[in-house]
Amino acid sequence: MNKKYIIAAMATSFALNMNAQSVKVTGTVVDSNNEPVIGAYIKVKGSNKGAVTDLDGHYTIDADKNATLVISYVGMANQEEKIGNRSQINFVLKDDANDLNEVVVIGYGQVKKGDLTSSISAIKGDKLEKLSTGNVMNALQGQVNGVQISGAGGPGASPRVIIRGVTTVNGSDPLYVVDGMPVGTNINFLNQNDIESMQVLKDASASAIYGTRASNGVILITTKKGKKGDAKFNVTATVGLQTLKKQNMADSQEYKKVYDTRYTNDGNVSPFKGSADTYTDWWKECINDVAVQQNYDLSFSGGNDKMIYSGSIGYYKQDSQYKVGQWQKLSARFSTEYNFNKMVKAGVDFTPRYEQWDDTPNLMSAIMAMDPTTPVMRAESEWTSNPYSNYERSHNNQEWNPVATMARMDSGASEYGLLATPYVSLTPIKGLTIKSAFGLNARFRRTDSFNVNFFIDNLEQNQNNNATRKMENWVDWNWTNTVNYMTTLNKKHNINLMGGYTMERFQDYWANAYSENIPNNDESLRYPSSGTKNPAATGTDSFTSLVSYLGRVMYNYAEKYYLTASIRVDGSSKFSKDNKWATFPSVSGAYRLTGEEFMKNQKVFDDIKIRAGWGKVGNQNIDNSAYLSSIGTTTYVFGGTPNRIIGSTVSGIGNTNLKWETVEDWNVGLDLALLQSRLKITADYFEKTSHDMLMKKDNLLILGYPMWNGQMWENVGKMKASGWELGINWNDQIQDFTYGVGLNLSQVKNKAVKLNGDYIWTGGFSGDYIVRNAEGESLSQFWGYKTAGIFQNETEVKSYTNEHGESLQPNAKPGDLRFVDLNNDGVIDSNDKTHIGNPFPDLMVGLNLNAAYKGFDLVANFYGTFGNDIFNKNIGRYAGTDGQNVYAGTYDKTWRTDNTGAEYPRLSVNDSNMNYKRVSDFFVEDGSYFRCKLLQIGYTLPKQWFNNKLNLRLSFSAQNLFTITNYSGADPEAASMGKSVTEAGIDYTGYPNPRTFLFGLNMSF
């Protein structure tokens, strides 16, 4: 009985105590202009209890007096308040520091995002970390408008990045600057988890401060730095599997049908060898079902009033989808900054790394073309002591056995690198900062390759094995000295001045050793010193240097009127003394309409800013000392003896008149923020024009120089790119549910304005060219014949005549393509060629979605291009024209007397009408695609489970999950790359982008 009374008393006491601690809290939420914030979410920290402000910004919530209220609203900074004994708590929300007040890195300085006058897109590193990739630029795809990123899927492959179109045939990659150190045009070495932010300088008014190397835009990368506080650790692990979509090739039965038909259509007997009952799945023999991708990272940071520090170590590995090949990299980073006193601080960013490749073969074309009736190996009774000679030769075409090719592969590379940027900064008076920074970017690479000797038959053999080793070192350094002064006069005149001087040196030296006849292809002797024949050694040492003077003035009045002007003067050793120096100026301005008094009382627009800018940037992407002629060694056979005599010859022709390529750029833009910054819109229109475009030209034979590859650098003309960009972003919060939608749209048109009256031909195809660049035309257009269907019968063939009754296609037969006499001169010849396709898209689209509810989060990123064409060389190659295997269903797609109205012309060994060997629109397909780049679902476990000491997030991701396209090839994105910007859109059957499924873990404590 006593127990019952005791329990009842305890329960009553507990209830009274709880009632005493629970209070009703009311209040009002307003913004910095004292306007009510509607829909702000007030939550009791550590619980699911919450409330939302009404139309007047009021809220009411019940909570424990020891609890803490957390208020959040999109576009504004979160606030926390402990309740204590208060029953009324009012909040004044300020703009989120990540919004207009966010600090954005610009060239040799930084500025508030709201004060930008140029076209600069900024993205935070946490968005880039979602997609697991070896090159962070793949993660940027679709995130920034005006930036076209096309990637291939091979291990270590670098994507092609084009910012606002192409204005030169001499490279398209932007300049990357990591923590103030220019590192060239490749950032494969960088650990994406180390990135704090990226800024894309898209117009010349922003990038002109980098002068000589900014013609293709500049991407500034800031790595993570330490912060004051206790040491924090973060562990990230991502492991997944990659798969390639299997190409649907014909089986042995269909292959034989197609092969035989090529001959019977010409009235010949098929020489088919082997048996259609034998089938080899070459895809299965060469391609793994899955390839493993791994990504691990450990980072730490912390600091105090005197010193901050951070560091990381990361490992990434991607296996090839082929049976051979892989790429891995190990990177580390350490960053520290020490404050000696209020005036002096110094720091260093130190990033060593190691990369290693086992070469991935380029065998997709051979795998698809290989005769499926051919076995992988010869019969054992035919084997020799050389295992590399025991593979079977293709029975019915000239393809080399791809399994044998992979077995013979023995090549790869390893590279050690170091990026270090120590600096010291002085602040002698308020607002004045003097900084001196030294940057070192060093790489040391060793490349080894061994070609075995083997004999399969007279067409597939190598009589002498050989070994090659190349040691190549690059050592670049940069010394930058800047002075910045910032001040505000009369509280309205904001001034930021910068002046500087830089020195840069780029050195490349290499040595190459070669020999032949390594005994028995011995794996332990595969290096040049083991060879007994034809030893050779070559090497060189070259360097270039750059000296620059730079300055910038930034002014704004009351954060309403803005003006920025910059100038950079560069001197480069790549040009002769008369053309060594170039000046790159820029000017930009902005007007904030919402800063006017008449805009104060409106509640729709939070920010309206109009921008305009103009500037010049340069390009010096040419050979070192291209203005100088050079002499090199060569060999020549004199008399009737086989002995080769070593001598000297002209190896390069200089051009003393060579001068800088410059790009003139102007841009107008509009930035809008509406509905309490939930909706943000950015729009830009731009034009870029290159002058004195640099290019190597094949004209030395005309000049009298007897060189097989006679080329000389020249300034050949002018190109233009123009277009528009539109970015729309919506972010909102409904209690515990937050979501965001981002849409990026952009269009760029490229045009060759002047080429000194010449054509630039690229993209070889059956002795002809696919691409023509001509004055007044769009860049890299496909140039060929128009077709008008297929001749269905002899009557149609005979009636296709000119006005004199002469046959326009005398070699044509029923089933052949009908080529159009475009100029109506009665003859079908090269004068009838015209534009048949455009490799560059009419529209680029990025769609980025995100949502979060309590511990769950979702990210979905999409990217697509529309209106671009692809020249699909594979249509002819895999239609059986030369005995290669064909796509499944080809037999039913090709014209025959019993299959008129077919999609493909008739098969023929002779192909006298050149259906499959003439550049025509028959090969051109719509290359548009829309791809789900990333779909990720994550869950963050409640922190209370770990005594509030650990954050743990688990995720599942699918990359390249699906692609919507009408393109018949393996991958429209990889195909759109071509080999260069002047061969964009030509499908060379490269490594497709794989579909990847990954599990991830992120832990911080």
Q: Language-model features: where?
A:
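Glycine-rich, aromatic-lined ligand/substrate-binding cores of catalytic
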Residues: 838-872
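Short, small/polar-rich motifs associated with maturation and membrane association
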Residues: 1-333, 338-341, 345-351, 419-420, ...
